Swiss-Prot record:
Pfam families associated with the record: AA_kinase
Location relative to the cell: Cytoplasm
Subunit comment: Homohexamer.
Biological function: Catalyzes the reversible phosphorylation of UMP to UDP.
Superkingdom as given in the UniProt entry: Bacteria
Name under which the protein is recorded: Uridylate kinase
Residues the record lists as binding ATP: K12, L13, S14, G15, G55, R59, N163, Y169, D172
UniProt entry tagged with the keyword Kinase: yes
Signal sequence annotation: none
GO MF term (any one): ATP binding
GN (gene name): pyrH
Chief place of localization: cytoplasm
Length: 238
């Protein structure tokens, strides 16, 4: 078995990562490709937890702009993340990876309720654990969910898998041709410079709990495995 740098990993997977080129909804072929990448990580012996976003289905801020109460819109977003959790669970189990979906909002007919010690036990048994439903409270993003769950399960790292962006830049590299990429940053750098890595609540929580992040392009095959093995790709935030 290959040597790995990070034993217990929390992967933040955006909803858009499951929608393919459409950018909205669900794409089975994309989910299959993502699942195969995750199986590689699992087969290395890493304990893998996943936090799903919901942006391919719904964003709370979208509803707020349309005149919805923010809390109500956020609850819709939480339900979107549960759909994504079930979708990636199916893709993983189709290729033989045992998984559990755990939700912050109880819906026992669909998934297990989130219980921290039970989640840790699943990881110890080699199951991939998918955290869905956000934190269960409105006004908190899935970035914050990632930082919270990583702290709760004592994850060694948060992997921020990005679509088509290979790290953290001082400007949007898709819009600014000479944007500068950072190889290493501190959490305080991210906060003070206003870099778009994760929201400020998530950044502060990661800093306070000494959880490193690696921001990388998930569209390049094998990158998740490379990060877990300790290869220097993307941007590391510590």
């Amino acid at each position: 078995m290959a040597e790995i740098k990070y034993k217990r990993v929390l992967l933040k997977l955006s909803g858009e990562a499951l929608s393919g080129e459409k950018g909205f909804g669900f794409d089975p072929e994309t989910a299959k490709a993502v699942a195969e990448e995750l199986k590689e990580v699992h087969d290395l012996g890493a304990e893998l937890a996943i936090v799903c976003g919901g942006g391919n289905v719904w964003r709370g801020v979208t509803g707020e702009k349309a005149g919805m109460e923010r809390a109500q819109a956020d609850y819709m977003g939480m339900l979107a993340t549960i759909q994504n959790g079930l979708f990636i669970q199916s893709a993983l189990e189709n290729i033989g990876v045992d998984t559990r979906v755990m939700t912050a909002i109880e819906m026992k007919a669909v998934a297990e309720p989130y219980i921290r010690r039970r989640a840790e036990r699943h990881l110890e048994k080699g199951r991939v654990v998918i955290f869905a439903g956000g934190t269960g409270s409105p006004y908190f993003s899935t970035d914050t969910t990632s930082a919270l769950r990583a702290a709760e399960i004592n994850a060694d790292v948060i992997l921020m898998a990005k679509n088509g962006v290979d790290g953290v830049y001082n400007a949007d590299p898709k819009l600014v041709a000479d944007a500068i990429k950072f190889e290493h940053l501190t959490h305080m750098d991210v906060i003070t410079k206003g870099l778009q890595v994760m929201d400020s609540t998530a950044s502060t929580m990661s800093m306070d709990n000494h959880i490193p992040l690696v921001v990388f392009n998930m569209n390049e095959a094998g990158n998740i495995t490379r990060v877990v093995r300790g290869e220097e790709i993307g941007t590391t935030v510590e």
